[in-house]
């Protein structure tokens, strides 16, 4: 795959596909984490004298955070100390004319790419290639740099459609992500511990199945709704209130799948031994085998309990490699953040090479100033897809582009 330092960019028109999709509150972007993550790539291209065209999506149609990229332009301008012009167009005449008049070292950001219907659908590369987006913009570009790791599991025109038409190059963030995740997945250092939490239960089950079946993990610790499903699969009852909630989320349908994983790998999947419920607004911990478990019938489980935190901490402190995705509970409420913070702090304090991902996981790491984690991934779904053994469309597109252009391009100094 092409790396950013393989080429020189002075006077070249470069389309940078970033993923600046960010949380929004009251119409304003409230986190610049993804902007900062892609900053080294942008700075390198501008320092080299590229004519830079930035593209990103923001949310999806009909959502409250489905906004224009005008604020994205402001945030980038402030971080870079130079103007990144907001262009209220994607591939229409206005955008194309502005791209043609770019000067070396200048940058623009196109309108929210998902304002174009083509970029909302997932289609194979060949179909993406035939879209208006690709056909209108490709003739104006010299290179495509892709730094949108968080969207690496998606196949859309702006992400993969240009790969056979122009050299598609990994940005610094993409390269860092691929290297860190590959190291964690391929290593033979033991013990290798996976921590699976949060609400993406089906994705987490795929990860568990893949890493256990292929000898890539030695133990899996579970929490969040993933932990709920595995706890039910072990035959424990989590009470009417929690079963009702899980039924609404469609999670009870996944219990059989979790049972099958346990049938094959029972000793290698750990589940919580106690939970914390919201008892009239307070945190009350209940042991899974205690007489107080009647509380599960009336009150929601919002975190793992202290005994589980300690058991997980002991395992993590002795790990050599840790992969974690998703929180242990509803960390947004301080009294139910103990599990997430306790587990992530243990990961940071351990001597292991650690990779942590998932939007909520990242938010909790920054919120509680957790340090010592080797690599904080910008991708949640993309990271889960990677560890579940799926082929990621963007990584496939990088390979296709490399094979097509490796002999035809005059490489810059390394």
From Swiss-Prot:
It is found in: Cytoplasm. It is an enzyme of class 2 (transferase). ATP binds at residues 332, 358-361. Its EC number is 2.7.2.3. Substrate binds at residues 19-21, 34, 57-60, 114, 154. Coiled coil: none annotated. It catalyses: (2R)-3-phosphoglycerate + ATP = (2R)-3-phospho-glyceroyl phosphate + ADP. One of its GO terms (molecular function) is phosphoglycerate kinase activity. GO terms for biological process: gluconeogenesis; glycolytic process. It comes from the Archaea. One of its GO terms (cellular component) is cytosol. Pathway: Carbohydrate degradation; glycolysis; pyruvate from D-glyceraldehyde 3-phosphate: step 2/5. Keywords: ATP-binding, Cytoplasm, Glycolysis, Kinase, Nucleotide-binding, Transferase. The keyword Iron does not apply. Monomer. Belongs to the phosphoglycerate kinase family. This is Phosphoglycerate kinase. It comes from Thermococcus onnurineus (strain NA1). The lineage of its organism: Archaea, Methanobacteriati, Methanobacteriota, Thermococci, Thermococcales.
């Amino acid at each position: 795959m092409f790396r950013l330092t393989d080429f020189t960019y002075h006077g070249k028109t470069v389309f940078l596909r970033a993923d600046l999709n960010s949380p929004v509150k009251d119409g304003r972007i409230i986190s610049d984490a993804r902007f900062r993550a892609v900053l080294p790539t942008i700075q390198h291209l501008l320092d080299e004298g590229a004519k830079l065209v930035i593209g990103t999506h923001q949310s999806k149609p009909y959502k409250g955070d489905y906004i224009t990229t005008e604020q994205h332009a402001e945030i980038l301008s402030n971080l870079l100390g130079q103007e990144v012009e907001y262009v209220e167009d994607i591939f229409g005449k206005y955008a194309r004319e502005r791209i043609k008049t770019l000067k070396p070292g200048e940058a623009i950001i196109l309108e929210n790419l998902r304002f174009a219907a083509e970029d909302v659908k997932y289609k194979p590369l060949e179909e993406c290639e035939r879209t208006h987006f690709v056909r209108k913009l490709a003739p104006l570009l010299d290179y495509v740099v892709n730094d949108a790791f968080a969207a690496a599991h998606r196949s859309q025109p702006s992400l993969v459609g240009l790969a056979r038409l122009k050299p598609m190059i990994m940005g610094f963030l993409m390269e860092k992500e691929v290297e860190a995740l590959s190291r964690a997945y391929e290593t033979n250092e033991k013990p290798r511990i996976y921590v699976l939490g949060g609400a993406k239960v089906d994705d987490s089950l795929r990860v568990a199945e893949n890493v256990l079946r292929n000898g890539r993990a030695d133990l899996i610790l579970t929490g969040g709704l993933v932990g709920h499903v595995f706890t039910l699969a072990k035959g424990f009852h989590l009470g009417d209130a929690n079963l009702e909630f899980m039924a609404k989320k469609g999670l009870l349908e996944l219990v059989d799948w979790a049972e099958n994983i346990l049938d094959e790998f029972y000793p290698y999947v750990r589940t919580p031994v106690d939970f914390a419920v919201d008892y009239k607004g307070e945190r009350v911990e209940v042991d899974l085998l205690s007489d107080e478990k009647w509380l599960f019938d009336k009150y929601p489980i919002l975190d793992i309990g202290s005994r589980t935190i300690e058991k997980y901490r002991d395992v993590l402190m002795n790990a050599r490699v840790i992969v974690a995705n998703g929180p242990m509970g509803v960390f947004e409420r301080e009294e139910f953040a103990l599990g997430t913070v306790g587990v992530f702090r243990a990961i940071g304090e351990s001597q292991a090479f650690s990779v942590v991902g998932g939007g909520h996981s990242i938010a909790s790491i920054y919120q509680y100033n957790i340090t010592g984690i080797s690599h904080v991934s910008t991708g949640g779904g993309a990271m889960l897809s990677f560890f579940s053994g799926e082929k990621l469309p963007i990584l496939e597109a990088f390979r296709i582009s490399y094979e097509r252009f490796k002999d035809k391009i005059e490489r810059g100094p390394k």
